[in-house]
Amino acid sequence: GILMEAQTGPVVYQKDADTRRSPASITKIMTLILIFDALDKGSLKMDDTVTTSAHAKSMGGSQVFLEEGEIQTVETLIKCIVIASGNDASVAMAEHICGSEQEFVRHMNERAEGLGMKNTHFEDCCGLTESPDHYTTARDIAIMSRELITKYPKILEYSSIWMENITHVTRQGTKEFGLTNTNKLIRKPFAVTSNKSGSVSYTHLRAHETSQ
């Protein structure tokens, strides 16, 4: 594990900080960085619409049950990723930005290299893969988490939401779907404003919390 002060970057505590492990849904921190990079450059807008592909719909694990052909705004999909850790929403955004998840993942690895994340390699954009070539470390998680919350503090507006409804509009009709934050710590009496939790059977990593 590792504890890093977000604003200036000093490491306060570390143990096995450079041990490679599977990041599971913590992968989505880098996915969010690339989404906000695109927003920052102006190539993406919050009210842009994104169409769900068959590949995005097929994602298992944590999902918000997007249907093939379903259209949602970028902001709604960001909420689906940040609040509910939606794998389907992550893939939909990856495909929208780069044309394919594979190309998006290439950019994820380039971004990680640019941040000096020396022990990280991504194979997908949501963390579902069981590939041994999909790995990171506590130190690298701290580096990318710091990049996200210091460069794009707007993320805290989404990560502090406990519950919110989205509307599915498909050929089957319209229905409400409730998003519930996967980070249960935001309901505790102390303030924890941001994190990305991740868990699969072979994962022993937890993203550090950002408390105020």
Describe each region flagged by the PLM.
Residues 1-139, 145, 149-150:
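Active-site-adjacent loops and short helices of periplasmic peptidoglycan-processing enzymes
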Residues 100-206, 211:
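Penicillin-recognizing serine hydrolase domain
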